[in-house]
């Protein structure tokens, strides 16, 4: 997802505090990193189904570090490995919340490897979503307001958490990428075509 913060348009479920997920310290992913090119629609690679990670090794952690660097540079708040051309089930998310007192951005990098949604609510939340692979385009997307998800972190530790709010929306958005789905695929054909036309117009003007 992009750094354009999702705008909450409608919320049915009661808001819960975003959990502080147990991941490796930020410095684990903020050293010796490289910025990777982000694939943009309509690149056919974005339609690939990503494969599970068999072992969380140094190669996976190096990719995670590069993904964080790429996401922060874009800037964005979420990135899937397939968006940098790697069809593996790896996601990175950092909501980069603001410090209420100093107003500074607080980084909170989170890693999701082989994520699965185990339960989801019938209640929906609608957020104005964007995507680094569909630059400068946004649309209101309805998703389950509360989910229970399972995943591995960057150290291979399993987590099972009940999530809601922005983190739940962002995780579902990024997990769509693992199935070859973009946020615009949730729209009607008319709305999707309008976004594609705007995207092509911006590219021609660049």
Give short role names for the model-derived ranges.
Residues 19-172, 177-206:
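Active-site rim/adjacent substrate-binding subdomains
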């Amino acid at each position: 997802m992009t750094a354009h913060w999702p705008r909450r348009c409608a919320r049915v479920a009661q808001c819960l505090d975003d959990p502080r997920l147990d991941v490796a310290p930020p410095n684990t992913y903020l050293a010796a990193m490289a910025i990777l090119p982000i694939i943009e629609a309509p690149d056919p690679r974005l339609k690939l189904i990503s494969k599970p990670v068999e072992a969380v090794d140094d190669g996976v952690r190096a990719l995670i570090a590069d993904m964080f660097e790429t996401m922060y540079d874009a800037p964005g708040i979420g990135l899937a490995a397939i968006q940098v051309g790697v069809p593996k089930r790896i996601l990175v998310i950092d909501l980069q919340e603001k410090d209420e007192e100093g107003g500074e951005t607080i980084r909170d990098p989170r890693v999701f490897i082989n994520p699965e949604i185990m339960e989801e609510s019938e209640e929906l939340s609608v957020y104005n979503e964007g995507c680094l692979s569909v630059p400068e385009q946004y649309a209101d997307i309805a998703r389950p307001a509360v989910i229970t998800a399972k995943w591995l972190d960057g150290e291979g530790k399993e987590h099972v958490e009940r999530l809601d709010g922005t983190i739940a929306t962002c995780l579902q958005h990024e997990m769509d990428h693992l199935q070859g789905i973009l946020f615009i695929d949730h729209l009607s054909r008319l709305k999707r075509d309008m976004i594609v036309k705007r995207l092509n117009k911006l590219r021609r003007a660049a």
